[in-house]
Every structure is written in C-alpha cells, then in structure tokens.
Amino acid sequence: MNNVDELTLDLPNFTGPLDLLLHLIRSQKIDIYDIPIAKITGQYLANLARWQTLDLQIAGEYFVMASTLLRIKSQYLLPKNDFIEEDQYQEDPRTELVEQLVQYSVFQRIAEYFKKRDEEMPITVAKDPSVSPKKEIEPLPLGEITSDELANTFKVVLERFKLRKPQVGKIEVHETSIEEMTSFLKNRLQKKRSTSFFDCIKSFQDLDQVIGLFLAVLELCRDHKILVKQNRDFGDLELEKVEINGK
C-alpha cells in the first residue's frame, strides 16, 4: 500500500506548510516528537508535485519548508562523526521543526477555541453585568496587561515549557481542560486574592494544562472576575481576583 498515494490533499484546505505537515502527522497518528522524516518528506513533496501538475498557485513558503525537510533528511543520511564521543550531546536535526509545529499547534487550537466561542455567542442568553458600566469603561490601571501583551507573554511561557516534553505527541485542548483550569484558578484565588501564572504552572507536566490555564485566564478576564497585570515586558503575569461588593 502506497502511503504517498493515500494522502493526496487539496491545497485550498491548508493555511500554510505547517498546517499541511500537522495534517500529515495527525492523520497517521504520528508522535510529533518522533517524526519519521523520510516518510513525511516524501508525502509532503508528493503533494507539492501533484499541486504543480494541477497548475495551482503555490505560495513560496511551501517550497521553503520543502527545502527544510530535505535538509533535515540529508542530515540523517550523513555518516556519524566517529570523533564525537557517544555521551556527547548532538541536537536532533528535527528539533527546530518540532518546536515550530508544537507552537503552531497550540495557537491553532486556541484560535479554534475562540472561533467556537464566537459561534456560540448568538445563542447565549444575556444577563445583567456583574460590574457597573462605570467600572467597565475605566481606563486600564498602570501595569494591567493588554491582549497583545498577553499573547506575547504566552509565547515566552511556551519557550519555558518546551524542555518539558508532553507525555503524548498528539496535542489536544478540550473544553473539559479549560473548565478544570477555571476551577483550579478560582480555588487558588479563593485561598489568596492574587497569584502568578508562572507559579500556577510549576507543577504542570503537560502542555495541555498550560494551554487550558491560559484559556481559563482569558475566560475569567472576559467575565471581569480577575485582573491580569504585568510589571515588565514578557514578565510573569499577576492574576488578581476582582472583588465585587466585598466578595
């Protein structure tokens, strides 16, 4: 059975080369941390070749990724250096690509989550605001973080977390994870009025938990139940419970 022939895909279905690669990996249940580079490269190039025969306009970034895959594949074909001792660390040629795929996967899942939330909004029953209109239109206090700064800080969180390999290669974000992390954060803020994002994730082992907590923070911010502050660029996030009527 020819795996390349089985995985012929349509170009318009993908937003870019990382999206295509993730599809190839997920559809075959491949561990994202142990990619069979020769197999995936062959399937990727086969799809590019097919798109070219169909006269489809292929963005240059797809060819850049093709050259990256071929470079990684060629590094595996090179003979091992006998002068390097066995216990001396040699970086896996796939490392940078894996990091890109993991980060892309995370933000893809977050985007999917917000798209789902937007689709649910029309059927949401409105309720009276839990804070006064005056409070809602007040400018952000000094130190309070904007959504762009929050996103940039989350990238730093991913960098910190990348050395902790998740227990599974297939990265998923489920609604239950977000609900669990919302409860986790509420309980933490019940004990003390403020905490920090980095402190919260110290004991986490899975990237799924980090993503779930990040989305829980956004949910609680949106509902005006917590404030998020940052004292320096890309620094820790201070999470503070909003007191309403002394509660």
UniProtKB/Swiss-Prot annotation:
This is Segregation and condensation protein A. It comes from Lactobacillus johnsonii (strain CNCM I-12250 / La1 / NCC 533). Its main location: cytoplasm. It holds the Pfam family SMC_ScpA. Transmembrane segments: none annotated. The lineage of its organism: Bacteria, Bacillati, Bacillota, Bacilli, Lactobacillales. It is found in: Cytoplasm. Participates in chromosomal partition during cell division. May act via the formation of a condensin-like complex containing Smc and ScpB that pull DNA away from mid-cell into both cell halves. Belongs to the ScpA family. Coiled coil: none annotated. One of its GO terms (biological process) is cell division.
